[in-house]
UniProtKB/Swiss-Prot annotation:
The gene is argH. It is found in: Cytoplasm. Pathway: Amino-acid biosynthesis; L-arginine biosynthesis; L-arginine from L-ornithine and carbamoyl phosphate: step 3/3. It catalyses: 2-(N(omega)-L-arginino)succinate = fumarate + L-arginine. SUPFAM superfamilies: L-aspartase-like. It is an enzyme of class 4 (lyase). It holds the Pfam family Lyase_1. This is Argininosuccinate lyase.
Amino acid sequence: MKLWGGRFKKGTDELVNDFNSSINIDSRMYKEDIEGSLAHATMLGEQNIISKEASLKITSGLLEILKRMDNNVINVDLTSEDIHSFVESTLTYYIGEYGKMLHTARSRNDQVTLDLKLYLKKALVKLRKDILYLEKVLLEKSKEHISTIMPGYTHMQKAQPITLSHHLLAYAEMFKRDIGRINDAYKRTDSMPLGSGALATSTYPIDRYMVAKDLGFSTITLNSLDSVSDRDYVIETLSALSLIMMHLSRFSEEIILWCTGEFNFVELDDGYSTGSSIMPQKKNPDVAELIRGKTGRVYGDLITLLTVMKGIPLAYNKDMQEDKEALFDALDTVTLSLKTFAGMIKTMKVNKDNMKKSAALGFTNATDLADYLVKKGSYFRDAHGIVGQIVLQCIKDNKMIEDLTLAELKEYSPTFEEDVYEAINLYTCVEERKVIGGPSSESVKFQIKELQEFIHQFKGDEMYD
């Protein structure tokens, strides 16, 4: 059933029908389409735009269709143009002429953005739960590794000693920001567009606030042209999804490196690894690699919609039909990525000894040696130069700084005393960094407490429970 056609002398070409159809994509919004139609039909009856009898017939029919679709008694007809025409034609088939009244005071232009907002609000709720679960995994892993020394890197060169807990909590901060962006996207999705019509509202005395309340929106949109033209909320969501994938990808890249024989910092659980068809010894970090690869796919979804929208005049244009495929693909990809990544991190084993050995072999305590001299009265720039000379000699002699005798150290500066060895002990290097945000156990425990409170604040929230 087409929702148009009176002014045409002949039907559309079958190829055009296939090209124009969106039913393969938007059929996943059947619940939202029916929910929106239920609220609309109820409002039409309350406003006496249609009779109470007609309103009741329509809502009863819609509820029956929803029940049958949920139970797979009714399946979507893929020859329909879109989910809106399918629901309306199915309704008319079941209840007769009353079904033709459903579209009174409504256009597909405001109907489709209503469906999409209803769908996206639910999806954002689920997405935030998935991120919060990953945060819980990072929280528990961080508690286990407050004292696990590892090298921190800059330019992928060993820099200063930190702890695995400190490292994991860095990603927890990223995902906290991601949750903030999801919350923001939800707020801007939470405005009800129905009643905007094709572009200029309606001549009927509709009650948009009633529909908004019935559907759980906090407000209504205020300009009908903008309402049917707006896909900012989709683009904002895609941007947030892209950042989530960027964070997962960065973390995945590190996991991939840590799994190598050269690093051997972690071992992934068999359940989150794969093998080789030819090399029996292989254990591959495919989950992390796939997440890294799928990041480009989500970026592509964002660029797709930005490109679609960049040249569109007001109001609705058919180009906008491309929004849902990009959004649904990104949502599906990010959701699966978050869940598999959380499982991978939760089950991975940490090689604490290898992490500490790696930190010890990279002169990661050189800054602390310079700081030792400064605290004894040297200027930092002078101390920096002295320690640089010490490191150079250690490299030549294949030694670590702590292998040098006090006499050897005094050749570079008479300031060195016996207490220097405690100052450059890796645990001391970490524990002395008590500044908020640092790797000391005191600082990390504070970060853990903050993360716990961040997670706890969502208890009882619709987007958590």
